[in-house]
């Protein structure tokens, strides 16, 4: 059976944030989250979904996903968090020897209607794969239909765990052309084996051909499929 698809539409506002730590500062950044930020998020009505770092972390990155009841709640929670004296104290203490971050990226997301229920889960040791697709013009709907009708079930058939699927909110610059999702695998090698068998599946081949025939070409841009393997952090609710 497929994982429980949310019975009702998940109307929460999600935010995926990517932090780039200054050289030598990633451990300090993670300590600040572990000791302070995660708890303070909860205090201010922010739901922690998951925290990860790339397995090959050349850019000193932290990737995390949080959730809010609504976009309005999002703005209110961030404002209150930023003004919290406990946060200000923790931030100052952590930056005594210099700033921890060089860059922050953020995208506001909605759950797709075919995403499994977005809630933290912990399983046997596993690796995560963050995949981002950029579609050709006008084809985000077709890409979602292909996932809804075929891909999600085929991923499971070939040993992958479907976790979360999102598209950017309407006011985000990638709203018309991006799908972001997270899978889990037993290992990076298992992921490779799963994708090899998935791509050779006649059901997938037929679904891909039919969707591309309907669109008059590929649903994704050249170089429009990005994949990054992640490992969950010790303080991540999803691990």
Q: Model regions: which residues?
A:
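Short S/T/G/P-rich N-terminal loop/turn motif that feeds into the first structured element of a domain
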Residues: 2-89, 93-206, 210-239
């Amino acid at each position: 059976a497929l994982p429980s698809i949310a019975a009702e539409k998940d109307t929460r506002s999600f935010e995926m944030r990517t932090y780039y730590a200054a050289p030598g500062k990633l451990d300090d950044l993670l300590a600040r989250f572990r000791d302070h930020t995660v708890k303070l998020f909860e205090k201010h009505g922010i739901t922690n979904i998951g925290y990860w770092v790339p397995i090959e972390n050349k850019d000193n990155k932290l990737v995390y996903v949080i959730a809010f009841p609504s976009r309005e709640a999002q703005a209110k929670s961030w404002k209150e968090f930023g003004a919290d004296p406990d946060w200000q104290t923790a931030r100052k203490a952590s930056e005594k020897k210099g700033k921890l971050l060089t860059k922050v990226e953020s995208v506001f997301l909605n759950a797709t209607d075919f995403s499994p229920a977005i809630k933290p889960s912990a399983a046997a040791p596993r690796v995560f794969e963050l995949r981002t697709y950029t579609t050709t013009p006008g084809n985000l709907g077709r890409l979602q239909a292909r996932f809804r009708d075929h891909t999600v079930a085929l991923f499971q058939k070939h040993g992958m765990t479907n976790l979360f699927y999102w598209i950017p909110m309407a006011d985000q610059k990638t709203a018309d052309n991006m799908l972001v999702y997270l899978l889990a695998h037993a290992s990076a090698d298992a992921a490779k084996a799963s994708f090899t068998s998935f791509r050779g599946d006649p059901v997938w081949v037929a679904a891909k051909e039919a969707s591309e025939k309907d669109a008059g070409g590929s649903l994704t841009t050249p170089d429009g499929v990005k994949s990054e393997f992640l490992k969950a952090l010790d303080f991540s609710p999803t691990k």
